[in-house]
């Protein structure tokens, strides 16, 4: 039975990048590793098959030959795959060190004492204006910071580390399992290769202590709820001098009493009287930049939208600003004075005449007419 296609084995395309090939191999190596499948012959074969495919596809020269001539071309170079696990672990010791955090055989690399600190997440609330125009905030948080007594080393001042007596400084101990050897983390030094003769009393050998610290956060203009700001190195300090983690600030923006936001655009509503809508007017409206004049054109209809370009929210990743959209609402009064009634009635009379219709008076208009007629008759009777 002929060999399977190497790309098919790893589950990648012929255009896959080196990183994609490595990622695919890691997945298969984890799945079919002998330690996870003891005594499973099928898994052993799949493990070897994946290793052979990776050996070819991660090597630029072998990959070029394979892409051009296939398996036959590789045989011409003397490549015949791996004979057993020892060949695989010997060839890919550094790869397995990266994949599994431990090595195989005596070639495994020792771990360093330092370990990076964890990342932190902080929730920060902003006003609407702060989110739109940007601001600077000072936040205070409790976190692990570098021990000032030992300067992060974990050792009592004046003392130093010594080589671990168990692993002799390698950070690993070798365990034999069948026909291959596995290097596991040394439990005495936790893989560090060194032990403290006299741990720092302030931090108990950790190289860091929990402290309160303040951090300045620069919030750029145009952020919104859900935006995350990354502050490199402002997370937890590393263990025994390791690099610090990062601080992620998650933003929450409070709503505005007048404006609503959608992306970089702002929306609001203004109310005008029906007389202003008919005749037009000049009114003042609030904007994020201060008050400004808004001209209501004669005959403005309810629901009309007026747009002001460039008066919205500054674009977070770009130049310029969004737009401001103003919707006009026309207020209809529920109570009017007799004088207003006369004017509106006359206006309606004109409108009806223009369209050839007869004016129908409002109920309260008829009542007023009856009252006026009655008063006139009473006046005539009094005179006689």
UniProtKB/Swiss-Prot annotation:
CXXCXGXG motif repeats lie at residues 147-154, 164-171, 186-193, 200-207. Belongs to the DnaJ family. It comes from the Bacteria. InterPro entries: DnaJ, DnaJ_C, DnaJ_domain, DnaJ_domain_CS, HSP40/DnaJ_pept-bd, HSP_DnaJ_Cys-rich_dom, HSP_DnaJ_Cys-rich_dom_sf, J_dom_sf. Zn(2+) 2 binds at residues 164, 167, 186, 189. GO terms for molecular function: ATP binding; heat shock protein binding; unfolded protein binding; zinc ion binding. A zinc finger (CR-type) spans 134-212. Residues 5-70 form the J domain. Homodimer. The J domain is necessary and sufficient to stimulate DnaK ATPase activity. Zinc center 1 plays an important role in the autonomous, DnaK-independent chaperone activity of DnaJ. Zinc center 2 is essential for interaction with DnaK and for DnaJ activity. This is Chaperone protein DnaJ. Residues 352-384 are annotated as: Disordered. The gene is dnaJ. The lineage of its organism: Bacteria, Pseudomonadati, Thermodesulfobacteriota, Syntrophobacteria, Syntrophobacterales. It is found in: Cytoplasm. GO terms for cellular component: cytoplasm. Participates actively in the response to hyperosmotic and heat shock by preventing the aggregation of stress-denatured proteins and by disaggregating proteins, also in an autonomous, DnaK-independent fashion. Unfolded proteins bind initially to DnaJ; upon interaction with the DnaJ-bound protein, DnaK hydrolyzes its bound ATP, resulting in the formation of a stable complex. GrpE releases ADP from DnaK; ATP binding to DnaK triggers the release of the substrate protein, thus completing the reaction cycle. Keywords: Chaperone, Cytoplasm, DNA replication, Metal-binding, Repeat, Stress response, Zinc, Zinc-finger. GO terms for biological process: chaperone cofactor-dependent protein refolding; DNA replication; protein refolding; response to heat. Its main location: cytoplasm. Binds 2 Zn(2+) ions per monomer. Its cofactor is Zn(2+). Zn(2+) 1 binds at residues 147, 150, 200, 203. Gene3D superfamilies: DnaJ domain, Heat shock protein DnaJ, cysteine-rich domain, Urease metallochaperone UreE, N-terminal domain.
